[in-house]
Design a protein with these regions (language model features):
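Metal-ion/cofactor- or nucleotide/acyl-coenzyme-handling active-site neighborhoods
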Residues: 1-197
């Protein structure tokens, strides 16, 4: 078995801490929830082998998918195998958590970076890109008040920030043989196998 490394792209504002050079130091890239690449290549590069998304997100165009080099689409919506395989207490996993768990369970992935995993904090901006760049299929989230005009989450997320934090720390402790990196606006403590960037 040859070892692999993967950078998993979330969409939180902490993406601003990232660089293309950091992303390019990983063998593979997984995009979660259809992040915006155009105009942000200096932060997140311009490639993704995996496209993890639920059915509410507008798919990348064929041209975008080819340009990014997407080879695998993984549906994270309800009733899918990836969602049914996940179990960790009462945590309702986001697409990013499902992607992380997918690679966590594969022994060949020994180096995993989580970029933009800001844990859906209430009254914090949710995405690194501008409101006008947001997927038009999800404008209802502004219309119903889930997000305010600044793109901040106004409600307690169904994904539950504290449960995500506990899950991630449990996995960092359980998989001591893997090296983890995290870019997050949430306060994580470094561990022997976790570098907080």
């Amino acid at each position: 078995m040859s070892e692999k490394s993967i950078a998993i792209l979330g969409k939180g504002p902490s993406v601003d801490k990232c660089t293309k050079e950091f992303i390019d130091s990983f063998d593979e890239v997984a995009a979660c929830g259809r992040p915006v690449f155009t105009g942000y290549e200096h932060l997140i590069g311009n490639r993704a082998k995996y496209d993890f998304a639920n059915r509410t997100a507008t798919p990348y165009t064929q041209e975008e998918a080819q340009r990014l080099g997407i080879e695998h689409f993984i549906d994270t919506g309800g009733g899918t195998k990836i969602r049914e395989r996940f179990s960790h207490g009462d945590l309702d996993p986001s697409t990013g958590i499902l992607a992380f768990h997918h690679f966590l369970e594969k022994p060949e992935y020994t180096k995993i970076a989580l970029i933009g995993f800001d844990l859906f904090q209430t009254m914090e901006k949710v995405y690194y890109y501008k409101n006008e760049e947001f997927d038009p299929a999800l404008t209802w989230l502004w219309e119903n008040g889930t997000y305010d005009s600044e793109g901040r989450l106004t409600i307690v997320s169904g994904h539950k920030t504290e449960l995500i934090f506990k899950y991630l720390n449990d996995m960092f402790d359980l998989y001591k043989d893997k090296q983890f990196y995290i870019m997050s606006s949430y306060k994580f403590s470094e561990k022997e196998n976790l570098k907080v960037l």
